[in-house]
């Protein structure tokens, strides 16, 4: 009898482990935290907007080559060419899916305190993407729920590096406000109404603007185009080629009322072709822009719609591991990045 005991025990143990493995995969909840984003999740995209799935590519290959085993010399796929420098630009990157051209201009802006014209440095980024999967919003928080009172701050640099970005700018300061719509990468994270005028990045890569007080978020997210991003800060600076602010317009919070400040502005030339400006301020050699000056400048670059993001000491432009501008916070001595709640990534 004893000689049958070991095989019996071993068989029961093996069977038990197999049952547990199935339960663990399908039923037993894990202890992992909820992750607020998935950079590889392209479920938002329809057949025409997103990158092709691997299965689709395989199916196409099988249709074109019904007898792959008969090919003695199959063609090798050419490696993607990536260009990382250009003589005409401060920074440059070009791949099949992303092109970023960065340069700096120095312009004259008005110092209304002293009634003189002063120099202001503006970093400009001309960005093209092949589809919206390369235009990402990313929170500083990794685990948990990204709402007011439960968030984590980090620098634009850290957020960009963690998101494997090539180019990034600071976001809309969602974490610093209790209300305001938040949609990132096709997912809704907050739908409480604020007084903000918002920017929506539609699923075809175009821009739209709307006021939260007049527009339920459900109306935006149910649009047939789909809402890929919704940023809540504002105001809109340019809409349909028209400047929407004047020299008296200013955000309701902030110290630079009607005067020069660091500005972060994102605009669109055409779907999937964007233009971004980050101006420096609070520096001896760079005074800053009013909202009207920021609108005039970016409109001169051919944008059709432009939107004001969180500026001031938060305004940061980052490229391939390097902060290009000199962020300056009035509450902190010296130059350095302010920790923020979110960033906009191109990858």
Whereabouts are the PLM-identified features?
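Loop/turn elements at helix/coil->beta-strand transitions in domains of secreted/extracellular proteins
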Residues: 163-166, 206, 242, 271-274, ...
């Amino acid at each position: 009898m004893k000689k049958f005991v070991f095989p019996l025990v071993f068989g029961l143990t093996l069977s038990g482990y197999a049952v547990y493995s199935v339960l663990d995969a399908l039923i037993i909840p894990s202890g992992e935290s909820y992750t607020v984003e998935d950079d590889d999740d392209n479920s938002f995209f329809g057949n025409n907007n997103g990158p092709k799935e691997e299965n689709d590519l395989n199916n196409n290959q099988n249709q074109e080559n019904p007898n792959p085993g008969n090919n003695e010399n199959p063609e090798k796929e050419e490696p993607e060419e990536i260009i990382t420098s250009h003589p005409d630009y401060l920074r440059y990157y070009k791949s099949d899916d992303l092109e970023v051209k960065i340069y700096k201009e120095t312009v004259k802006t008005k110092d209304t305190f002293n009634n003189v014209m002063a120099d202001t440095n503006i970093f400009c980024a001309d960005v093209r993407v092949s589809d919206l999967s390369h235009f990402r919003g990313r929170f500083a928080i990794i685990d948990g729920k990204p709402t007011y009172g439960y968030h984590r701050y980090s620098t634009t640099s850290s957020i960009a590096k963690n998101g494997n970005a090539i180019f990034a700018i600071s976001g809309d300061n969602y974490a610093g406000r209790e209300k305001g719509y938040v949609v990132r990468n096709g997912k809704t994270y907050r739908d409480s109404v604020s007084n903000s005028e918002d920017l929506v990045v539609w699923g075809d890569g175009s821009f739209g603007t709307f006021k939260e007080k007049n527009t339920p978020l459900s109306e935006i997210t149910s649009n047939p185009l789909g809402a890929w991003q919704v940023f809540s800060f504002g105001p809109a600076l340019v809409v349909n080629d028209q400047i929407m602010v004047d020299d008296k317009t200013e955000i309701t919070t902030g110290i630079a009322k009607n005067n020069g400040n660091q500005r972060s502005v994102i605009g669109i030339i055409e779907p999937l072709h964007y233009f971004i400006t980050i101006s420096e301020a609070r520096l001896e050699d760079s005074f800053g822009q009013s909202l009207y000056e920021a609108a005039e400048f970016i409109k001169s670059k051919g944008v059709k719609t432009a939107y004001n993001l969180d500026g001031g000491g938060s305004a940061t432009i980052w490229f391939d591991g390097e902060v290009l501008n000199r962020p300056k916070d009035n509450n902190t001595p010296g130059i350095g990045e302010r920790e923020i709640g979110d960033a906009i990534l191109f990858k």
